[in-house]
Amino acid sequence: MLEQMGIAAKAASYKLALLSSGEKNRVLEKIADELEAQMESILSANVQDVEQARANGLSEAMLDRLTLTPARLKAIADDVRQVCNLADPVGQVIDGGLLDSGLRLERRRVPLGVVGVIYEARPNVTVDVASLCLKTGNAVILRGGKETHRTNSATVRVIQKALKACGLPEAAVQAIDNPDRSLVNEMLRMDKYIDMLIPRGGAGLHKLCREQSTIPVITGGIGVCHIFVDSSADIAPALKIIVNAKTQRPSTCNTVETLLVHQDIAERFLPALSKQMAESGVTLHGDETVMQVLHGPAKLVPLKPEELDNEFLSLDLNVVVVENMDGAITHIREHGTQHSDAILTCDMHNAARFVNEVDSAAVYVNASTRFTDGGQFGLGAEVAVSTQKLHARGPMGLEALTTYKWIGFGDGTIRA
């Protein structure tokens, strides 16, 4: 079954690569329109998935990721339209020039070909990835989690209807709707057909893909994100940033999980933090210093060492007091996932040092980690957030779904 999907996807990718920007945008507009027109069927499938997942004991954080609402689905359709407005990188000449030999050389952006994406309980990924792949002339094979198979199947049917209406092969966007996990292992060996693989899920999925895949893999999306409250931080705006980074949508990978507090500001800052977190319903996981300083009003539990390496994806926040900037940077290097980290400070020398020494895909000064998102970065919907350094890093927009080829123009030109 998967080999036939691969053959069809590869054939579709050749046709997609020839489309003009206008033709690709018309396809995306049709997809957005169909998502809104077929909203009832998608939401009905999603309700069944959510009910089944709840019965299976899925966590509230995962249920939130799984759930679609009319507003969320409308936002997904709007994201597709936003992709239409983005510049098409395909065909762009990156650089080039006339060589001494007389050969005129260009380095030009081209589609990757076929992209494979494995993801868990995130139905929005189906549309986000499909729209970005189509915009860049790539075919895509999707493998969502068993928790979302009804939603994904319904969504892909809508996308394929739009493709067919535009005269394009339905195989340009395909989903593996069989929840059998053995198919993941088979997909990981489809290097004959799939040019790049992107896993979006937990640490176990990423480990499996890194160890078993014969396809180049882009990993990321695991976000043990940190905020360091420097000794010079302005407490009021700092609290506002922390509330946003922790509570806006706790189940996302760009949510802060560990707060590092400079010891010189701890006694003034921690009580204010506790009050704010109590109002926001956040449980604090405090180290020894925090446990000594705080006595409410926020719920406070002792920090377990292993929690420093975990994504809570919930209204829980580690709080650690550090001696200085060195302590904060060392902690992030030991426990961070190179996703998103921030410093809250009024000292621009410290800000510059933090930016230069923290080796993460996104580093912020006096801003929330929640900005690490394709839409927020102006990239449109993202295919993933990469925490590695090759071939992409950070939110993966359109350019991350392209490669390049060298094109030489001559006039009977030969090498001397």
UniProtKB/Swiss-Prot annotation:
Coiled coil: none annotated. Its EC number is 1.2.1.41. Pathway: Amino-acid biosynthesis; L-proline biosynthesis; L-glutamate 5-semialdehyde from L-glutamate: step 2/2. Keywords: Amino-acid biosynthesis, Cytoplasm, NADP, Oxidoreductase, Proline biosynthesis. SUPFAM superfamilies: ALDH-like. It catalyses: L-glutamate 5-semialdehyde + phosphate + NADP(+) = L-glutamyl 5-phosphate + NADPH + H(+). Belongs to the gamma-glutamyl phosphate reductase family. This is Gamma-glutamyl phosphate reductase. It comes from Salmonella newport (strain SL254).
